[in-house]
Structure formats: structure tokens, C-alpha cells
Amino acid sequence: MEITEKAKKFAIMAHFGQVRKSEKDKPMIIHPIDVAYILKKYGFDDNVVAAGYLHDVIEDTKYTKNDIYNNFGEDILSLVMGDTEKDKSLSWEERKEITIEEVKKLDLRHKAIVCADKISNLEDLIICFVKFGKKDFSCFKRGYEKQKWYYESIYESLIYNEDENIPMFVFLKDLIDEAFTLEENNFVKDEIFKGKQREYKKLKNLHFRKVELMKLKRLFDLPTYVIEFTGTPRTGKTTLIN
């Protein structure tokens, strides 16, 4: 079995029953599938793509570093750990400050996973803005200013000692500007779409609706899996049966 397919199956099993923190109507597995897709799109090797599927497993499920190492080896474990917060007992600010400094030290393969993770999250955030018609950060424990600081700082850490013109870094920067600029760039709206404000808004909405649909399509493109569950919800065990 290819390493990426094995990682995908493991992620499906590990995140079974979980939903997105920001959107309770969506299964958690949408996000790692999206991250892996982004990494593949930008041409990264199979181990990096596999780590994209697995990047939230240690942080958000019962599975441990040993589980990743025993199933996927040292390289993929290292890639996953590059996008895993080490000490959840620290405050949000402390954890993010540590992450910002640690990302600077990573090589490009490790940075790519962090970048793809942030791209996926920001696309989801912008989709929510489009749905509700406004930029609302109230769903976050830390609001606009802290989120803006974190994403902009992570971007600076990603391009540290790297070429800022690497396509995925450029795309991340565009998404950060889109998400955290409260005043719209009026050139496109007022000059290109002069007198056609409704058409501009519709086109923008359609674009991000398409992004959302493509994320969902990647989920529905998965082959059928059978998941066997034994035990109680707290102590139960899930087994993936192809």
C-alpha cells in the first residue's frame, strides 16, 4: 500500500466522529484531507503529503508519537511534529510564541506542512465570512488582533531564510491579507466593477463557495471504508477495515 493511502486511512480512523471546531456540521477529516491535497498540488514528496493527512493526529486524537513512528517511520513523525504543539498546558499566547520561534528553524519540507495547514484554515475562515456577510472573529477564544498577530507572525517565520516568492507562501500571504484587512481594497470593486457592486459581491461569493465545494468534493471522492467500533465512547477502539 502506498504511504499516502496508508496515512489517509489512518487519519480517517483517528479522526472518526470528530467535527471541525469552527463548523460543527463538518467532519474533522475534511481538514487533513485538504492539507494533504494542498501539499500534493504544490509538488511535495509522498512523505510530506502523508504527514499532511496525519498532522493533527497527535494533537487532537488519542494516538501518540509512538503510533506514528511505528506505522510510518522517523521522517513522517518528524514532519508531523513540526506542526504539532508540544505542551497544551501552556496558555494560547505562550504556545503560539513557541510555535512562531520553532517554525523559523524548520526546513522547507516541514514548513510546507505548517503553511498548508494555515492555508486550509484561512480558506475555511474566509468561507465563513462570505456565508455570514461580515468578518466576525467572535468564534475564536482570541479575537481579531491576536489572530492577526499569529498568522502574520507565522508567515514571517515561514519565509525566514526562504524565498518569499515560493508559490504557496505567496498564496498564504494573499489569504492573510484577505482575512485580516477589514477595509476592502476598493480598486477592484470601484474601478473594475464600477457601478456593478452587486455583481462584484456575487462573484466574490461564488469564488469562495466554489472553494468550499471543492473541499467537500475531495471528501466525497474518498473510497468507501468500513470502520468497526468496539467498547464505549470513552474507552472504545476503532478499527479500519478496507
Task: Describe the residue ranges of each PLM region.
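Generic low-complexity, intrinsically disordered sequence content enriched
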Residues: 176, 186, 207-210, 220
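Hydrophobic anchor at the beta1->P-loop junction of P-loop NTPases
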Residues: 229
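Active-site helical microenvironments for divalent-metal-assisted chemistry
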Residues: 1-194
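Walker A/P-loop
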Residues: 238
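N-terminal pre-Walker A segment at the start of P-loop NTPase domains
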Residues: 192-217
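Phosphate-binding P-loop
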Residues: 217-224
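Walker A (P-loop) phosphate-binding loop of P-loop NTPases
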Residues: 234
